[in-house]
Amino acid sequence: GDASSASSFAVDVAGFFQTEEISYNDFNGRWRAGFNLQNLGPKMSYDNTQSSTNFLPSNMKLGGGFDFILDDYNKVALNLEVSKLLVPTPQDPDLNGDGTITTAERNENNQNYDNIGWVEGVFQSFSDAPGGFSEELKEVTYSAGAEYLYQDSFSLRMGYFHENPDKGARQFFSLGAGFRYSAIKVDVSYLFSTSKVKNPLENTLRFSLTFNFGDQYDEY
């Protein structure tokens, strides 16, 4: 087909809060919480007509965690995150109630969807699932993770991600480890799927190498 350009813009809005270290009976601890609203912006426009616009993949993430600071050398971190797409669900109702959705009705439904503004769409995404509130909950993905950290230099990690089978069925565990020396950090992780649906990243081993310039680290 003919090449065409598209235009839009997007912003992210995020916040993070972490408490000071709190003393408990047998350990110290630290709470944290955060949010991230991603890709907020006008619909992607491929020309100047309303029918050639698409919603950006706006997304909301809410997370929290707690650090078990066992002593000067050992720390365990637990984290939980929920995520939801902030895009309205396309609707295709039977407008005249005769039991049949005609081409004219479908065109009207599509036009009604195209007329939804991006701000309206963000709010509408919380209440427009055809199956009601129970289906809205199915649109939420859940992630949980744990990390053991020794001397802020060596870490072991594990995590789990869950997406409802009706909404994509991505479900997988991950295992990982990390090592930091001076300004160099090496991380490795392995992902394996627990879903019947194939994941392109399942059974993959991933490495990352990070150089941190400007910060000072203790060397062990």
Question: How should each PLM-predicted stretch be described?
Answer:
Residues 1-220:
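Outer-membrane beta-barrel porins/channels
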